[in-house]
């Protein structure tokens, strides 16, 4: 590649002139230096700019006079400019129109500061190749950063923009993937202008054959700021914004189509206009395609202090009764996201068909021929100015008092959903229809609440009124189980109903329909009658519940319930299980078979750690539990066959429920145990009694209910085995075992929230019978062991609970998680004995349906 470094203007001119008599060559120009570079008309296969241009005040970056480039024009250079009327890259037509056969691509950083300063200015240039279909050519692309600042406050005499395209012919796209920032009056981020220098000239001189796409960021600040503007452009394609366009200033417009027809304006990003009379998207005397999936489409955010989307077309007559150009209308489609405007969300100029398929509209809707609701749409609009509003499918959520100027239809299966709160005037219709309102059979008028205080007393509201009402079989009902709708009447061209806080019995069916489980329905019904009806309307609990949607209500209903997942009971059972496992392994090593015939009396200590995970079972949320404990014991031989012992254990268990609740349980157990052996037969048993101190914390709507209560546990364990010697070192012991445990929890009353519960006493029994195999070996000083057992619970007890709210009211019952029939256990251990000392470690694994637990034990023993 031929590199053109910093040359004089004359040298560049000579080089360009001589190229007319030689084959075009690729050119690379290093733009570094303090004065501008001028490139005369010439032929090039491509053009690349490199370096960093730190120019003197008033000096441009680089100017081209009608370059003829068969390939791409790529800027990899950086420009820092200051002074009046400067631009970084200029392509003019002083001697000839320019031509770029490929694309113009900016990868650099441009900083231009001064009155009427600009970034890139391309005029009277053909970019691309007519009739050639190639996405890589014909484009103007910004991948870099362009900053333009003009603090003079004086309107520019020439067009001012970060990227200015005047009278250009593009066979491709205009694409911004980078960052554009402009601070100036009457300036644009990207502007394509097809008007000649004579402002009265109505001929379009600019053409874009493909799309205008922004996936980057465009920010323009100043009076009459423009984000993207197409003025008198032969276009007919798409403007797509998947990035961010922000404009700020009086009269600012984020996206403006001025006498430039288009196929579609699609927003999936953010378009925001701040300032008096600002506009998000403006279509001025520019027609869009009105076919399905065309026109102006929003899937993102369009917000303006003035008007979100504005249509202006003085070329059409839109007065009352006007029928000329009846087919020339605009199509606006709201699929998702938000369209909002301080003056109006949408102004269709009487020429627009509006399709509302989803999302939210904030602000008045004006100038609409026909509006169709085809999905779930929320509107915060005082005015819907439309000849016809047709709710064909889904639900139209009306969040404030709204006037519909034309006729309105609510079709079969569709709904009109109205929000009420204390600011709603009961005597004034929430939706007032100036024309005829038709409610088809199967249509629904729903009532719900929006954030704000709502009185508990049943009050008569005017839901809908019309100049003429035709009810063909509409249903009026509540959309939240916490409200009751009664005394519905269709009279005097109005729909009225009494609305108030529902009683528990009234709310039951709605709670179930909202997906609240059986326990949640019981707890919520009691809460409504016993607590909610007594709360001030401005309390946290009241506001949280009354304004909850279905998903939030399901969560709140779970929070209201007492713990029904057996977590507290399981914590006490875990303490007995850990203790009995430790004592069982100790007792099994006492007899003659173990090779410890000389042992008469000894003391031992074991350190325990276990963790368990209970998954959801029977629709009841699970929990995780971590246990740590210490056991101290002593035992001795009563005779050659019998050994008796006593142990004291203390186990702490922290339970974290999947609902977010916590329970801490501290259990102290006293255990008597013994072992008997006669030949190959052995029997091991234990009896334990203990007490637990329980501290529970439940969380309801961000408030904590704390409980402090006691429980006691009784447990017994008995097993019998028959020893089969596999060899001189290893024994196999088939084993039968049974175990029983009962946990009794005292009644208690929570504190800390008005949703606190008074919970009755509870009990839970487990009776396991099972069998399995044990392996015990002696290899010198080492004694390995292993076991595999299976148990069946014949008690099948569940943790059912009877509770009432501490504020009073009737009790309600909740059903606990169902018991597990089968339990499977496996364990391994290893002891090492030297003289009178023994140390060892063991690991046990427990598996049930939706449950698993791990236990690790370290032990030490001294024999007297």
Language-model features: locations:
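Outer-membrane translocation/initiation segment of Type V secreted surface proteins
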Residues: 2-4, 8-10, 24-37, 450-630, ...
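Extracellular beta-strand/beta-solenoid scaffold signature
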Residues: 25-38, 54-66, 82-97, 113-133, ...
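Outer membrane beta-barrel transmembrane domains
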Residues: 671-675, 726, 751, 758-864
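Outer membrane beta-barrel translocator domains of Type V secretion systems
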Residues: 535-728, 831, 842-861
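Extracellular beta-strand/loop-rich repeat segments of large surface/secreted proteins
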Residues: 369-460, 467
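Membrane-embedded beta-strands of outer-membrane beta-barrel proteins
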Residues: 104, 140, 174, 239, ...
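Solvent-exposed, glycine/polar-rich loop segments of beta-barrel outer-membrane systems
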Residues: 617-625, 658-661, 693-710, 743-765, ...
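Right-handed parallel beta-helix
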Residues: 45-53, 71-80, 101-111, 137-149, ...
């Amino acid at each position: 590649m031929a590199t053109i470094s910093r040359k004089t203007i004359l040298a560049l001119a000579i080089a360009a002139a001589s190229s007319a008599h030689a084959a075009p060559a690729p050119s690379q120009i290093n733009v570094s230096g303090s004065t501008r570079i001028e490139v005369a008309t010439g032929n090039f296969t491509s053009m690349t700019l490199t370096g960093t241009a730190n120019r003197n005040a008033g000096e441009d970056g680089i100017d081209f006079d009608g370059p003829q480039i068969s390939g791409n024009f790529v800027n990899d250079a950086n420009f820092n400019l200051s002074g009046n009327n400067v631009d970084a890259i200029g392509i003019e037509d002083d001697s000839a129109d320019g031509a770029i056969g490929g694309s113009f691509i900016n990868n650099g950083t441009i900083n231009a500061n001064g009155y009427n300063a600009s970034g890139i200015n391309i005029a009277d240039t053909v970019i691309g190749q007519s009739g050639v279909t190639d996405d890589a050519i014909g484009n103007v692309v910004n991948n870099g950063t362009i900053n333009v600042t003009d603090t003079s406050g004086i309107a520019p005499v020439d067009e001012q923009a970060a990227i200015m395209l005047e009278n250009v012919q593009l066979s491709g796209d205009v694409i911004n993937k980078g960052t554009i920032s402009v601070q100036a009056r009457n300036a644009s981020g990207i502007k394509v202008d097809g008007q000649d220098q004579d402002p009265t000239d109505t001929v379009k001189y600019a053409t874009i054959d493909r799309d205008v796409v922004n996936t980057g960021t465009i920010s323009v600040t100043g009076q009459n700021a423009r984000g993207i503007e197409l003025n008198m452009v032969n276009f007919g394609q798409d403007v797509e914004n998947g990035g961010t366009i922000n404009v700020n200033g009086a009269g600012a417009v984020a996206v403006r189509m001025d006498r430039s027809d288009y196929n579609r304006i699609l927003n999936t990003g953010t378009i925001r206009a701040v300032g008096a009379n600002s506009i998000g998207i403006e279509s001025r005397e520019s027609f869009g395609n009105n076919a399905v999936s065309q026109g102006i489409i929003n899937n993102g955010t369009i917000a303006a202090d003035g008007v979100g989307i504005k249509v202006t077309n003085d070329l059409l007559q839109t007065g009352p009764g006007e029928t000329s150009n009846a087919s020339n209308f605009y199509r606006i489609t709201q699929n998702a996201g938000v369209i909002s405007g301080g003056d109006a969300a949408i102004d269709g100029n009487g020429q627009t068909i509006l399709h509302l398929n989803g999302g939210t509209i904030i602000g008045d809707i004006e100038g609409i021929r026909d509006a169709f609701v085809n999905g779930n749409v929320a509107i915060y609009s005082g005015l819907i100015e439309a000849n016809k509003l047709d709710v064909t499918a889904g639900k139209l959520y009306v969040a404030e008092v709204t006037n519909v100027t034309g006729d309105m239809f609510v079709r079969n299966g569709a709904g009109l959903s109205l929000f009420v709160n204390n600011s709603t005037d009961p005597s004034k219709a929430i939706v007032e229809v100036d024309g005829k309102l038709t409610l088809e059979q199967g249509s629904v008028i729903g009532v719900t609440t929006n954030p704000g205080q709502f009185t508990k007393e049943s009050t008569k509201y005017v839901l809908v009124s019309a100049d003429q009402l035709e009810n063909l079989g509409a249903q009026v009902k509540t959309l939240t189980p916490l409200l009751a709708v009664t005394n519905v009447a269709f009279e005097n061209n109005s729909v009225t109903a009494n609305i108030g806080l529902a009683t528990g019995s009234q709310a039951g069916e709605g709670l179930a329909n909202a997906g609240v489980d059986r326990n949640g329905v019981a707890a919520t019904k009691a809460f409504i009658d016993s607590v909610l009806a007594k709360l001030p309307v401005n309390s946290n609990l009241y506001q949280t519940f009354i304004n909850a949607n279905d998903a939030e209500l399901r969560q709140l209903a779970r929070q209201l319930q007492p713990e029904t997942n057996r977590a507290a009971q399981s914590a006490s059972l875990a303490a007995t299980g850990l203790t009995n496992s430790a004592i069982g392994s100790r007792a099994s090593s006492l007899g003659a078979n173990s090779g410890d015939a000389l042992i008469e009396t000894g003391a031992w200590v074991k350190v325990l750690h276990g963790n368990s995970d209970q998954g959801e079972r029977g629709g009841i949320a699970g929990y995780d539990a971590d246990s740590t404990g210490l056991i101290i014991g002593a035992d001795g031989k009563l005779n050659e066959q019998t050994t008796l012992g006593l142990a004291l254990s203390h186990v702490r268990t922290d339970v974290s429920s999947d609902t977010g609740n916590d329970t801490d349980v501290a259990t102290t157990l006293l255990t008597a145990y013994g072992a008997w052996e006669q030949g190959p037969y052995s029997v091991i048993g234990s009896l334990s009694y203990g007490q637990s101190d329980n501290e529970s914390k439940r969380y309801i709507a961000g408030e904590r209910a704390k409980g402090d209560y006691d429980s006691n546990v009784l447990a017994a364990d008995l097993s019998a085995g028959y020893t089969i010697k596999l060899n001189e070192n290893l024994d196999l012991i088939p084993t039968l075992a049974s175990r029983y445990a009962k946990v009794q929890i005292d009644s208690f009353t929570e504190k800390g929230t008005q949703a606190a519960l008074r919970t009755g006493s509870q009990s839970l029994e487990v009776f396991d019978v099972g069998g399995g195999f044990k392996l015990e070996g002696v290899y010198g000083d080492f004694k390995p062991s292993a076991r595999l057992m299976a148990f069946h619970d014949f008690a099948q007890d569940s943790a059912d609970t009877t509770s009432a709210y501490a504020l009073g009211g009737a009790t309600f019952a909740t059903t606990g998680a169902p018991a597990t029939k089968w339990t499977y256990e496996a364990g391994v251990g290893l002891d090492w004995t030297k003289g009178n000392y023994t140390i060892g470690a063991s690991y046990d694994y427990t598996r049930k349906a939706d449950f698993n637990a791990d236990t690790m034990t370290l032990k030490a023993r001294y024999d007297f």
